[in-house]
Amino acid sequence: MSRIAQAFQRAQAQNRAAFIAYLCAGDPNFDTSLAACRAVITSGVDLLELGVPFSDPLADGLTNQLAAQRALESGMTAADVFRLVRRIREFSEVPIVFYTYYNLVFAHGIDAYVRAAKEAGVDGLLTLDLPPEESDEVSAACRAHGVQSVYIVAPTSPAERIAKIAQAATGFIYYVSREGVTGVQERVAANIPEAVAAIRRHTALPVVVGFGISNREQVRQVAAVADGVVVGSALVNCIRENLGSPERITAKLAAVAGDLVAGTKR
Protein backbone atom coordinates (compact mmCIF):
# COMPACT_ATOMS: atom_id res chain seq x y z
CA MET A 1 0.00 0.00 0.00
CA SER A 2 1.30 3.47 -0.88
CA ARG A 3 2.20 6.07 1.73
CA ILE A 4 -0.69 8.20 0.47
CA ALA A 5 -3.22 5.39 0.91
CA GLN A 6 -1.81 4.59 4.34
CA ALA A 7 -2.18 8.21 5.44
CA PHE A 8 -5.87 8.30 4.54
CA GLN A 9 -6.43 4.89 6.09
CA ARG A 10 -4.85 6.01 9.38
CA ALA A 11 -6.94 9.16 9.48
CA GLN A 12 -10.13 7.20 8.79
CA ALA A 13 -9.28 4.72 11.57
CA GLN A 14 -8.94 7.68 13.94
CA ASN A 15 -12.33 9.07 12.83
CA ARG A 16 -10.93 12.22 11.29
CA ALA A 17 -10.08 13.70 7.93
CA ALA A 18 -6.49 13.75 6.74
CA PHE A 19 -4.82 17.14 7.04
CA ILE A 20 -2.77 18.25 4.05
CA ALA A 21 -0.41 21.19 4.50
CA TYR A 22 0.79 23.24 1.53
CA LEU A 23 4.14 25.00 1.60
CA CYS A 24 6.21 26.37 -1.27
CA ALA A 25 9.59 24.65 -1.57
CA GLY A 26 12.39 27.12 -0.86
CA ASP A 27 10.26 29.82 0.74
CA PRO A 28 11.97 32.05 1.80
CA ASN A 29 15.19 30.04 1.33
CA PHE A 30 16.29 26.40 1.41
CA ASP A 31 17.22 26.11 5.08
CA THR A 32 14.17 27.94 6.43
CA SER A 33 11.92 25.98 4.08
CA LEU A 34 13.32 22.71 5.43
CA ALA A 35 12.72 23.92 8.99
CA ALA A 36 9.18 24.99 8.03
CA CYS A 37 8.43 21.54 6.60
CA ARG A 38 9.75 19.93 9.76
CA ALA A 39 7.56 22.22 11.89
CA VAL A 40 4.30 21.32 10.14
CA ILE A 41 5.16 17.63 9.93
CA THR A 42 5.88 17.38 13.64
CA SER A 43 2.59 19.18 14.30
CA GLY A 44 0.76 16.15 12.94
CA VAL A 45 0.02 16.79 9.27
CA ASP A 46 -0.85 13.67 7.28
CA LEU A 47 0.41 14.75 3.86
CA LEU A 48 2.69 17.53 2.67
CA GLU A 49 1.80 19.30 -0.55
CA LEU A 50 5.02 20.89 -1.73
CA GLY A 51 4.66 23.71 -4.21
CA VAL A 52 7.40 23.78 -6.84
CA PRO A 53 8.25 27.48 -7.33
CA PHE A 54 7.29 28.79 -10.76
CA SER A 55 7.50 32.27 -12.26
CA ASP A 56 3.94 32.22 -13.64
CA PRO A 57 1.72 30.35 -11.14
CA LEU A 58 -1.68 31.04 -12.69
CA ALA A 59 -3.74 29.00 -10.21
CA ASP A 60 -2.24 30.69 -7.18
CA GLY A 61 -3.39 33.76 -5.32
CA LEU A 62 -1.09 36.57 -4.22
CA THR A 63 0.10 34.83 -1.04
CA ASN A 64 1.40 31.79 -2.89
CA GLN A 65 2.68 33.85 -5.82
CA LEU A 66 4.83 35.84 -3.41
CA ALA A 67 6.04 32.62 -1.79
CA ALA A 68 7.17 31.32 -5.18
CA GLN A 69 8.84 34.65 -5.90
CA ARG A 70 10.75 34.54 -2.61
CA ALA A 71 11.89 30.99 -3.33
CA LEU A 72 13.05 31.82 -6.85
CA GLU A 73 14.83 34.98 -5.69
CA SER A 74 16.71 32.89 -3.13
CA GLY A 75 18.07 30.82 -6.03
CA MET A 76 15.84 27.76 -5.65
CA THR A 77 16.16 25.38 -8.62
CA ALA A 78 14.51 22.10 -9.60
CA ALA A 79 17.56 20.27 -8.26
CA ASP A 80 17.14 22.10 -4.95
CA VAL A 81 13.49 21.04 -4.73
CA PHE A 82 14.49 17.40 -5.13
CA ARG A 83 17.25 17.95 -2.55
CA LEU A 84 14.71 19.42 -0.13
CA VAL A 85 12.59 16.28 -0.44
CA ARG A 86 15.62 14.09 0.22
CA ARG A 87 16.37 16.10 3.36
CA ILE A 88 12.77 15.69 4.55
CA ARG A 89 13.09 11.96 3.99
CA GLU A 90 15.94 11.92 6.52
CA PHE A 91 13.44 12.52 9.32
CA SER A 92 9.94 11.76 8.00
CA GLU A 93 7.94 9.29 5.94
CA VAL A 94 5.02 11.68 5.52
CA PRO A 95 3.59 11.44 1.98
CA ILE A 96 4.77 14.27 -0.26
CA VAL A 97 2.82 15.46 -3.29
CA PHE A 98 4.37 17.92 -5.73
CA TYR A 99 2.07 20.81 -6.65
CA THR A 100 3.50 21.98 -9.94
CA TYR A 101 2.89 23.29 -13.45
CA TYR A 102 3.41 21.45 -16.72
CA ASN A 103 6.13 23.77 -18.03
CA LEU A 104 8.40 22.73 -15.17
CA VAL A 105 7.84 19.04 -15.83
CA PHE A 106 8.23 19.39 -19.61
CA ALA A 107 11.39 21.52 -19.41
CA HIS A 108 13.11 18.89 -17.27
CA GLY A 109 11.94 16.03 -19.49
CA ILE A 110 8.76 14.28 -18.39
CA ASP A 111 10.20 10.86 -17.61
CA ALA A 112 13.37 12.32 -16.09
CA TYR A 113 11.35 14.67 -13.87
CA VAL A 114 9.05 11.98 -12.53
CA ARG A 115 11.96 9.59 -12.03
CA ALA A 116 13.95 12.22 -10.12
CA ALA A 117 10.91 13.04 -8.00
CA LYS A 118 10.41 9.39 -7.11
CA GLU A 119 14.08 8.86 -6.32
CA ALA A 120 14.01 11.88 -4.01
CA GLY A 121 10.99 10.52 -2.15
CA VAL A 122 7.94 12.10 -3.79
CA ASP A 123 4.71 10.09 -3.64
CA GLY A 124 2.33 12.02 -5.88
CA LEU A 125 2.20 14.61 -8.65
CA LEU A 126 -0.45 17.28 -9.11
CA THR A 127 0.16 19.17 -12.35
CA LEU A 128 -2.28 22.03 -12.05
CA ASP A 129 -2.57 23.07 -15.68
CA LEU A 130 -2.57 19.57 -17.21
CA PRO A 131 -6.04 18.14 -17.92
CA PRO A 132 -6.37 14.34 -17.99
CA GLU A 133 -6.97 14.20 -21.75
CA GLU A 134 -3.53 15.76 -22.31
CA SER A 135 -1.70 13.85 -19.60
CA ASP A 136 -0.85 10.54 -21.30
CA GLU A 137 2.92 11.05 -21.13
CA VAL A 138 2.90 12.29 -17.55
CA SER A 139 0.53 9.53 -16.45
CA ALA A 140 2.68 6.90 -18.13
CA ALA A 141 5.80 8.23 -16.40
CA CYS A 142 3.98 8.24 -13.07
CA ARG A 143 2.89 4.63 -13.55
CA ALA A 144 6.38 3.59 -14.62
CA HIS A 145 8.03 5.12 -11.57
CA GLY A 146 5.38 4.48 -8.92
CA VAL A 147 4.26 8.09 -8.48
CA GLN A 148 0.54 8.65 -7.94
CA SER A 149 -1.42 11.04 -10.13
CA VAL A 150 -3.62 13.68 -8.52
CA TYR A 151 -6.18 15.71 -10.47
CA ILE A 152 -8.39 18.68 -9.71
CA VAL A 153 -12.18 18.81 -9.93
CA ALA A 154 -13.63 22.32 -10.17
CA PRO A 155 -17.03 23.54 -8.93
CA THR A 156 -18.05 23.86 -12.59
CA SER A 157 -17.03 20.32 -13.61
CA PRO A 158 -20.00 18.37 -15.06
CA ALA A 159 -20.56 14.69 -14.25
CA GLU A 160 -18.90 13.40 -17.42
CA ARG A 161 -15.83 15.52 -16.67
CA ILE A 162 -15.67 14.21 -13.10
CA ALA A 163 -15.86 10.65 -14.44
CA LYS A 164 -12.91 11.26 -16.78
CA ILE A 165 -10.84 12.83 -13.99
CA ALA A 166 -11.69 9.99 -11.61
CA GLN A 167 -10.56 7.45 -14.19
CA ALA A 168 -7.19 9.17 -14.61
CA ALA A 169 -6.42 9.75 -10.92
CA THR A 170 -4.59 7.22 -8.76
CA GLY A 171 -3.76 9.05 -5.52
CA PHE A 172 -6.75 11.17 -4.57
CA ILE A 173 -9.14 13.68 -6.09
CA TYR A 174 -8.61 17.34 -5.21
CA TYR A 175 -11.83 19.36 -5.19
CA VAL A 176 -11.26 23.10 -5.32
CA SER A 177 -13.97 24.65 -3.20
CA ARG A 178 -14.32 27.78 -5.30
CA GLU A 179 -13.58 29.12 -8.74
CA GLY A 180 -10.47 31.24 -9.17
CA VAL A 181 -7.16 31.08 -7.34
CA THR A 182 -5.88 30.01 -3.95
CA GLY A 183 -6.18 32.27 -0.91
CA VAL A 184 -7.92 32.88 2.40
CA GLN A 185 -11.70 33.36 2.46
CA GLU A 186 -14.17 34.21 5.21
CA ARG A 187 -16.42 31.16 4.84
CA VAL A 188 -16.38 27.83 3.08
CA ALA A 189 -18.66 27.17 0.12
CA ALA A 190 -22.08 25.83 1.07
CA ASN A 191 -22.13 23.26 -1.74
CA ILE A 192 -19.11 21.23 -0.58
CA PRO A 193 -21.16 18.26 0.76
CA GLU A 194 -23.02 17.91 -2.54
CA ALA A 195 -19.83 18.31 -4.57
CA VAL A 196 -17.96 15.67 -2.58
CA ALA A 197 -20.91 13.28 -2.91
CA ALA A 198 -20.99 13.84 -6.67
CA ILE A 199 -17.29 12.97 -6.97
CA ARG A 200 -17.69 9.86 -4.82
CA ARG A 201 -20.26 8.53 -7.26
CA HIS A 202 -17.38 8.09 -9.71
CA THR A 203 -14.49 6.91 -7.54
CA ALA A 204 -13.45 5.09 -4.39
CA LEU A 205 -10.35 7.29 -4.11
CA PRO A 206 -10.15 9.78 -1.24
CA VAL A 207 -11.65 13.19 -1.98
CA VAL A 208 -9.89 16.20 -0.49
CA VAL A 209 -11.04 19.81 -0.46
CA GLY A 210 -8.82 22.86 -0.73
CA PHE A 211 -8.57 26.52 -1.81
CA GLY A 212 -9.60 29.15 0.73
CA ILE A 213 -9.69 27.04 3.91
CA SER A 214 -7.81 28.95 6.58
CA ASN A 215 -8.97 28.32 10.15
CA ARG A 216 -9.93 25.53 12.51
CA GLU A 217 -13.69 26.02 12.16
CA GLN A 218 -13.48 25.88 8.36
CA VAL A 219 -11.34 22.74 8.63
CA ARG A 220 -13.95 21.22 10.94
CA GLN A 221 -16.77 21.95 8.49
CA VAL A 222 -14.92 20.40 5.55
CA ALA A 223 -13.60 17.45 7.57
CA ALA A 224 -17.17 16.44 8.34
CA VAL A 225 -17.74 15.50 4.69
CA ALA A 226 -14.37 15.11 2.94
CA ASP A 227 -11.56 12.58 3.31
CA GLY A 228 -8.95 15.31 3.53
CA VAL A 229 -8.57 19.05 4.01
CA VAL A 230 -5.89 21.19 2.35
CA VAL A 231 -4.65 24.43 3.91
CA GLY A 232 -2.04 26.54 2.18
CA SER A 233 -2.27 30.33 2.32
CA ALA A 234 -2.85 30.42 6.09
CA LEU A 235 0.41 28.52 6.56
CA VAL A 236 2.35 30.47 3.94
CA ASN A 237 1.26 33.66 5.71
CA CYS A 238 3.09 32.43 8.81
CA ILE A 239 6.28 32.65 6.76
CA ARG A 240 5.47 35.97 5.10
CA GLU A 241 4.63 37.65 8.42
CA ASN A 242 7.86 36.54 10.09
CA LEU A 243 10.50 36.97 7.41
CA GLY A 244 13.92 37.49 8.92
CA SER A 245 13.28 35.23 11.91
CA PRO A 246 13.39 31.50 11.14
CA GLU A 247 12.65 30.81 14.80
CA ARG A 248 9.41 32.82 14.70
CA ILE A 249 8.45 31.18 11.40
CA THR A 250 8.77 27.66 12.75
CA ALA A 251 7.10 28.49 16.07
CA LYS A 252 4.14 30.12 14.33
CA LEU A 253 3.81 27.31 11.80
CA ALA A 254 3.85 24.68 14.53
CA ALA A 255 1.14 26.50 16.47
CA VAL A 256 -1.12 27.19 13.48
CA ALA A 257 -0.70 23.74 11.94
CA GLY A 258 -1.38 22.06 15.28
CA ASP A 259 -4.57 24.06 15.71
CA LEU A 260 -5.75 23.22 12.19
CA VAL A 261 -4.98 19.51 12.63
CA ALA A 262 -7.19 19.52 15.72
CA GLY A 263 -10.11 20.60 13.52
CA THR A 264 -10.02 17.40 11.48
CA LYS A 265 -11.58 15.27 14.23
CA ARG A 266 -15.13 14.25 13.41
Curated annotation (Swiss-Prot):
Keywords: Amino-acid biosynthesis, Aromatic amino acid biosynthesis, Lyase, Tryptophan biosynthesis
Keyword Amino-acid biosynthesis applies: yes
Catalytic activity: (1S,2R)-1-C-(indol-3-yl)glycerol 3-phosphate + L-serine = D-glyceraldehyde 3-phosphate + L-tryptophan + H2O
Active-site residues annotated for this sequence: 49, 60
Cellular component terms (Gene Ontology): cytosol
Pathway the protein contributes to: Amino-acid biosynthesis; L-tryptophan biosynthesis; L-tryptophan from chorismate: step 5/5
PROSITE patterns per the UniProt record, alphabetical: TRP_SYNTHASE_ALPHA (PS00167)
InterPro entries xrefs: Aldolase_TIM, RibuloseP-bd_barrel, Trp_synthase_alpha_AS, Trp_synthase_suA
Task of the protein: The alpha subunit is responsible for the aldol cleavage of indoleglycerol phosphate to indole and glyceraldehyde 3-phosphate.
Similarity comment: family membership: Belongs to the TrpA family.
Description of how the protein assembles with itself and partners: Tetramer of two alpha and two beta chains.
PANTHER family recorded: TRYPTOPHAN SYNTHASE ALPHA CHAIN, CHLOROPLASTIC, TRYPTOPHAN SYNTHASE, ALPHA CHAIN
Name of the molecule in the record: Tryptophan synthase alpha chain
Species of provenance: Opitutus terrae (strain DSM 11246 / JCM 15787 / PB90-1)
